Every structure is written in C-alpha cells, then in structure tokens.
A protein has these predicted regions:
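Amphipathic, interaction-prone secondary-structure segments
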Residues: 32-36, 48-76
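Amphipathic protein-protein interaction modules
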Residues: 61-115
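Intrinsically disordered, low-complexity regulatory regions enriched in serine/threonine/proline
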Residues: 100-146
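N-terminal low-complexity, intrinsically disordered segments
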Residues: 1-43, 47
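Solvent-exposed amphipathic alpha-helical surface segments
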Residues: 41, 45, 49, 92-93, ...
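A short linear-motif detector with a strong N-terminal bias
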Residues: 28, 40-43, 51-53, 61-64, ...
Length: 146
C-alpha cells in the first residue's frame, strides 16, 4: 500500500501577532515569526533552507533545497494558521513514473516533530490538498503520512 502524504497543516500559535497595518490595510502579513521558528527548526535538523520571503500580501515562504527536489513552504493565516508544503522539481522523474516523495515526507514529518515539541504551537491537524479544500480545514489527521 502506498502511503498518502498530507501536505497541508493547520495549527494555532501563542506567538505574538507580527502583522503590521497602516490606515486599516495590512502592509506586512503576520506569521513571519512563526515561519521563522519552523525554518530554524529545520535548519537545526540539517535541512538546507533558503531565506524567508514575503509571499504576495498574505504570507511568508521559503524553500528547502535537496539533491532531488525543492520543497516550497508557505504559511498564511486562515484561522488557524495554514502551512502548505509543495514539492518542486523532479518533473522528468515523475513523467517517467519514478516518483520519490521521501524528501517531502521527511520534511512534513520534521514539521510534525518541531510543532509537537514547541509549547507555543497546538491543535496540529494534517490534510491532503483535496481534504483541506473539501472540509475547509475542519477535521484532519494527527500525522502527515497515512
């Protein structure tokens, strides 16, 4: 049986809100400090991570660079926080039917560990993209891998 990878995670955080507004408009989205905590946790565990960048006007992102692919990571607030991971690269292998999601799985499992070990995070739930869209982030699963 092939393991199903859940790449969307929702969770709450007690870290301070770092969103900045001007004249009632968001000028800098919140979540930079939260993604920074996750980013640093991955780096401490040996992952090669890019710098964190603002993603459009609603979130923050960075990439994990591995030999076989890149994993793009985004956080945005959708009550609660939403973490999305997406595998980039390795298109030729996937077209040839050789799909290795082991790096992506390891990243999601490491996010699971980082969030579980940090008392400023709680209520972690995992979803596939389809599950998240269908349930609007309600329910979910305890682990990123089925």
């Amino acid at each position: 049986m092939i393991a199903m990878l859940r790449t969307y995670a929702t969770f709450t955080s007690s870290l301070p809100d770092d969103q900045q507004e001007k004249d009632g408009e968001i000028v800098i989205p919140g979540g930079r400090n939260i993604l920074g905590r996750l980013h640093d946790g991955l780096a401490r565990r040996g992952f090669s991570v890019s710098e964190i960048k603002q993603h459009e006007d609603y979130g923050w992102c960075f990439e994990i660079v591995a030999p076989s692919c890149r994993i793009w990571c985004l956080i945005q607030f959708c009550e609660p926080w939403l973490l999305i991971t997406d595998r980039c690269g390795g298109l030729l292998k996937r077209l040839l039917g050789v799909s290795d999601d082991s790096t992506h799985r390891k990243v999601c499992e490491t996010f699971q560990d980082i969030i579980a070990e940090d008392s400023s995070f709680s209520e972690l739930r995992w979803f596939t993209k389809a599950e998240f869209e269908e349930t609007k982030g309600q329910g979910g699963h305890d682990k990123p891998v089925k």
